[in-house]
């Protein structure tokens, strides 16, 4: 498939044009025209690029790409080396951030919920697009049991605050990645618990004082599954040779 056709295909699937983001979504670095082999991963790090080069990939598809609004526009240093490697090897780089977080089927929230047996997802925020969501545990469980479930599923021990929550978790808020700022909204919406990737100092106070359990399961760990699902969809529906490469990150 043509590289621009692939961009259009993913844009349409993820409804990228309907979501305001702080990074460009779509084809970020243009490479060869024809695409057959795709490497997917969470972040367009040098390690992922090197792996794609070793596999003779035509494209890299990630959740965390480049050209964030807060970063310098200069192509130098670490960013310069990464982009040079892409250009020299004629590899396309596609990045999809918030559209991949919120997609109801392939998104990070939806995929994490599926893995943790959380059903009936609903938006936490009012408006057309909600980044955080809430759902119901298929089987209510204690905070301790849910922490053990997270560790087993994600292969990572979560940071937890389970001091003042209810006896059993039924309703749980979800926002993968750096979503700790939504904990107060989850409390307002009557959630028994909130799971995200990161934690801030004030997050623990919010959990303690508002009486809900909090689980920080890792930015990388909670966002592996959306990009993986997107790649699997491309392989199944369009016949691409797709490989998900997990470049481990404890953060």
Swiss-Prot record:
Superkingdom of this protein's organism: Bacteria
Protein name as it appears in the record: GTP cyclohydrolase 1 type 2 homolog
SUPFAM superfamilies given in the database record: NIF3 (NGG1p interacting factor 3)-like
Highest classification ranks of the organism: Bacteria, Pseudomonadati, Pseudomonadota, Gammaproteobacteria, Pasteurellales
Keywords associated with the record: Metal-binding
Binding positions (a divalent metal cation 1): 63, 101, 223
Known partners and oligomeric status: Toroid-shaped homohexamer. In the hexamer, 3 dimers assemble to form a ring-like structure surrounding a central hole.
The organism of origin for this protein: Haemophilus influenzae (strain ATCC 51907 / DSM 11121 / KW20 / Rd)
CC per GO annotation: cytoplasm
Family assignment from sequence similarity: Belongs to the GTP cyclohydrolase I type 2/NIF3 family.
This protein's record includes keyword tRNA processing: no
InterPro entries: DUF34/NIF3, DUF34/NIF3_sf
């Amino acid at each position: 498939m043509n590289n621009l056709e692939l961009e259009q295909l993913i844009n349409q699937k993820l409804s990228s044009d309907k979501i305001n983001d702080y990074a460009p979504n779509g084809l970020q670095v243009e490479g060869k025209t024809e695409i057959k082999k795709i490497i997917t991963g969470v972040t367009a790090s040098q390690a992922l690029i090197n792996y794609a080069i070793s596999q003779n990939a035509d494209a890299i598809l990630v959740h965390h790409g480049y050209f964030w609004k807060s970063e310098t526009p200069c192509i130098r240093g670490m960013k310069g080396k990464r982009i040079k490697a892409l250009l020299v090897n004629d590899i396309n780089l596609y990045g999809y951030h918030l559209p991949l977080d919120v997609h109801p089927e392939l998104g990070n929230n939806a995929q994490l919920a599926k893995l943790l047996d959380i059903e009936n997802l609903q938006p936490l925020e009012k408006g057309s697009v909600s980044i955080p969501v809430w759902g119901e545990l298929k089987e209510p469980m204690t905070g301790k049991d849910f922490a053990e479930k997270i560790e087993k599923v994600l292969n990572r021990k979560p940071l937890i605050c389970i001091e003042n929550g209810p006896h059993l978790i039924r309703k749980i808020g979800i926002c993968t990645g750096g979503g700790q700022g939504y904990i107060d909204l989850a409390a307002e919406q009557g959630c028994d618990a909130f799971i995200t990737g990161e934690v801030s100092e004030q997050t623990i106070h919010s959990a303690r004082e508002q009486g809900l359990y909090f689980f920080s399961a890792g930015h990388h760990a909670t966002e592996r599954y959306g990009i993986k699902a997107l790649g699997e969809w491309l392989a199944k529906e369009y016949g691409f040779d797709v490989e998900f490469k997990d470049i481990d990150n404890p953060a």
